[in-house]
Every structure is written in structure tokens, then in C-alpha cells.
Amino acid sequence: MWCLIAHGDGARRRTAIARSVALTGVWLMLAWPAAAQTQPGAADQETVRRLIERVEELERQVRELRQSQAPPLDVPSPQGDLSSANEHNTHAGDVTSPGGGVSPVADIHWFGDVGFRASDQQSDTSSFTVGQLDLFLTSSLTDHLNVLSEIVFRAGADNRYVVNAERLLLQYAPNPYLRVGVGRYHTAIGFYNTAYHHGSWFETAITRPTMFAYRGGLIPIHDIGVFASGRVPSGTLGLKYVFEIGNGQSSQNPANEATQNSADENNGKAFNVGLSANPERFPGLQVGFSTHRDRLKPANAAVTDQTTIAAHAVYQGTALEWLNEIVTVRSARLAPAPDSVTTGLYTQVSRQFGQLRPYFRYQYINASAADAAFRTLGLRHGPTLGLRRDMGKFAAVKAQYERLKRRAMPTVNSLTGQLAFTF
């Protein structure tokens, strides 16, 4: 209530000062020509000087009042706000705190999904499911410093909800050529892992490509550390770089969380280097590659240098989307043990027809039996067919059929439906 009264008093005061400035200005405009027609005396000159000083004083008071009041908050269009949220460059405004200081304001988005899944795999049951509930927040601390947080609520294998801080970043971006971040981030391996995070509403398909799965995929999804990214002066080629260094993945105990949030199990650090191009001549096209290196020290096993190389070529136009990626993981053991290579790839194409977007994906993974981290994947491949229908700007319903062929195992056919939304 007191805030409302103070705000009303400030508004009335600004109105009174503005009225005084206007009346004084009108008086000056009327008086000045008359004074110019005759030889001005000392008294007239003194009167004009005082009036000018009064106007300047009133203008100064108006400026001080405006600075002391909270600036109006910008309300961007919902669609533009959401699209920038996934690119991690949304910045919030500031407001005046009750104590008179300026406090940052968080820009908040929620993403969620519910669905149904059925398959002919013997161990599966048809089930309604509640997917991830994603709380995405950003806040500007200064013009170049911001915080990003992504907290996900999801059901575990025991049907109990667990809460994970999927991303927590403090980012400094003084210019388009440098952005430095520290905290927990999605590794920039390939395209999909940084283009699509934990909000299913952004994704065309219901499921992620297997090699980018949150659990059981080919790449480390998260890491804790420092990264730098930005543009490379390259004219119309549109080059961008990224460099990351972090704790890497846990390997000593399979029961532990893979992402080493609080302590690294060894002194070695993982690093990732990537380069991509967005040529102006081909709008919507991006090609790039990345190399990730980590040293794993599993218990009762040989030390392993794991190198992950990823390459992608994607096109995202107004209607047409075509994603192509390949990932190769080479595990070199520092002992008389054979090295292993695991490869995964996928292609996904879709096209918008009004509110409808049919899509097709084909994926292939050939995991080495000598690699304990991936051997359960084996050889698997198959197509995915689906249809997405946008229900306005903030919700989409999806239906998907997937056929999965596995080496020495029965083929699995599955049907999945999903309602994804943001609010």
C-alpha cells in the first residue's frame, strides 16, 4: 500500500513540475519577442535570466525524479521471449527494491509434458507418463553479466519425483566475440545437445536421438567447469568457436552420478573444442565439428583416454528442417588391452504445413563390445515416424511410431504420444 501511495505522490509531483516547466516555457515564448522589439533594460534581462535558471532547475528535478523511480519493465512478445530462452541470451530488467537499491529481476519460464507410451517389448507396460517439469530462469546482473538456471523435476524409476539442477551458469559477455561462463552446463558436443535442452516443447520429435539421450547415450550431457564461446571475425562465413574445460565424467563407481558436481575423482580435466559456420549465403545452414577429451580411471580396469569427435550439418529454414550428425567415441586404454570405437549417427527431416509438422528420423549406433560404457547399446538402428501439431503458440501435441532393430535381440515397435507446453 505504501508503495502505491509513494508511486502516486511521485507521479503527482512529476505532473506538477512538468506543468510548471510548460507554463514557464510558454511565458518565455510570449515575452521574448516583445522584449526583443525594444531595447531591453537591466530589469528585463535579469527577469529573463531568472526564468531561464528556473526552467533549468525544474528540468533537473524532473531528471532526478525519473532516475529515482523504477523504470518500466519491458514485456516482450511471448513467442520471442521463449525462442530466446532456449538460446540462453534472455536478459531481465531491474526494479527498485523497498530499501531504495536496485535488484535484478528473474525472467521465468516453465516447460512441461505429459504423454502415453506402449510397445511390444515383453518387459514394458503401457503407461501414461508425466515427463520433465522444467523451471528455466535468467537474470541480468549488469549489462554484460547474467545468471542462467535450469531446474528439472522428474519422476524416477521408483515413481518418486527427484529434483536436479541441470544447468547453473554465471555468464559474462562483453561483446559478440567473447562469452565466458562458469558453472554446470550442457557440453557443446555436436548440435543437438546445445540446441535442445530440457524443454520438450522446443523439440520436433518426442524422443531425443539415442546418442544424445540424457542417460545411456554416447556423449557426456553435462559438465562442471568453465567455457568460452563467441564469434570469429570471418566476414560472411559466420564462424563461431567454443572451448570448455571441466571435471569430466565419473568412472570409478558406476553407481555414482556421472556428472561430478562437487568433487572430481582425479586431478585430470576434460576439455572440448568446437567450431561452427553459419554462412550468410545459405541462411539456416550450420556446419560444425567438435572434439572432446577425457581421461577415465575406472576401478580395477585400465586407465582410458576417451576421445569423442562429433560433426554436424543442419538446415533450419522457415518450413524445412534437416538435421544430420555423427559421433565417434574412441577409447584408448593405457595397458595391453584393445582400443575400442563406438559410432552413432542420425538424420532427421521435417516440414511445416500450417500447424502440422510431419517428421522422419533414422538412427544407427554400433557400440563396441569391448567398451563397458556402451556395450549394452550393441548394434541398433531403425526409423522413427511422427507428427507434431502446434496448438497455438504455447502447446503442441505429438504422435510417434518407432521401430528398433537390435543385434541378436527381438525388434521392438513402440507408439508414443505427448502433449508438450510452456507457461
Label the predicted regions.
Residues W2, A34-S119, F423:
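N-terminal periplasmic/intermembrane-space "pro-region" immediately following the signal or transit peptide
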Residues G8-G10, G25, G93:
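Residue-identity detector for glycine
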